[in-house]
Structure formats: C-alpha cells, structure tokens
Design a protein with these regions (language model features):
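TPR repeat positional signature
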Residues: 51, 65, 101-104, 133
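Short, small-residue-biased leader/transition segments that mark boundaries at the very start
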Residues: 1-2
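Structural register within alpha-helical repeat arrays
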Residues: 28, 68, 103-104, 137
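Inward-facing hydrophobic residues that define packing positions of alpha-helical scaffold repeats
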Residues: 8-12, 51-52, 84-85
Length: 143
C-alpha cells in the first residue's frame, strides 16, 4: 500500500480510459482494494479474523470472501487472494456481475512479470505461478 497515493496521481490523466485497457482496469481494482483496506479502520489481522469467522459461519458468504480477497490484494498476498476468489468462482461463477472473476484476472495482470524480448517466431516463457493460476481459473470457469 506504500505506492497508493503516487499511483492515484499518476493514474488520474488516464482514468477515463480505464474500461478500454485491461491493465488500467487491473490497476484500478488494486487501488480500490487498497482503499477498502484503508477504510476498514482496524488492523489487518483483526479484519481477517472477523472475515474468517463470517466465512466459517457461512461458507457461501461471498461478500465476506470477496472482502477477504480485497484485503489480501491490498497487502500483496496474491496467491491467498486468488485462492479466496477461486472459492467464490467454484461456488457461483457469475456472483455479483462476475466481480470475483474480474478481480482474479486483475491479480493475474498485476503479478505477471513483463515478457522478455525474444527472437522473432519464438514464444516468451510464462511465469509458472501465473500459468498455474490461469489454469485454475479456466478449470473453475469451465467446470
């Protein structure tokens, strides 16, 4: 969350184009997650404990799962956030107008390292973590 305010300032001139470029949308979703985390007003661990208890009481509390994923995203706990979003996708693919899927894709966009330059006709290597979570998303969506 250290770069949040700098990112907002840098992002302001292109905010109108957010829906046109997926990478911008992904950055906006990250900043929204950071705003959510800041707005909780409690310590992150306290908020996680509260969300965990809500989820334990109702495994289908997708709002709590999504809030937990946003909190994890804000603290750059990418794999934990994607695992939580996958839990939503496996139970209800279209929950809240595909919000979990969109957030999941945003995390993939954010954590994917830049592709190295390769010779013409060659395919750049995939990041193993990103490739693994893309497969998991495909499995959840297509099942």
């Amino acid at each position: 969350m250290l770069f949040r305010s700098d990112a907002k300032v840098a992002f302001a001139p292109v905010i109108a184009k957010v829906t046109l470029v997926r990478r911008f949308d992904s950055l906006q979703r990250l900043m929204d997650a950071q705003d959510f985390a800041l707005g909780l007003g409690t310590q992150p661990m306290e908020a996680l404990v509260e969300l965990d208890s809500r989820i334990a009481a109702n495994r289908r509390d997708f709002a709590a799962r999504f809030d937990r994923a946003r909190l994890l995203m804000a603290h750059q706990k990418w794999t934990e956030a994607m695992d939580e979003l996958l839990e939503i996708l496996m139970r209800d693919k279209a929950w809240s107008d595909d919000l979990a899927r969109k957030a999941y894709i945003a995390v993939l966009d954010i954590i994917e390292p830049p592709k190295p330059k390769v010779a013409d006709g060659q395919i750049p290597p995939d990041d193993p973590l990103v490739a693994s979570y893309r497969r998991r998303l495909s499995s959840a969506i297509l099942s």
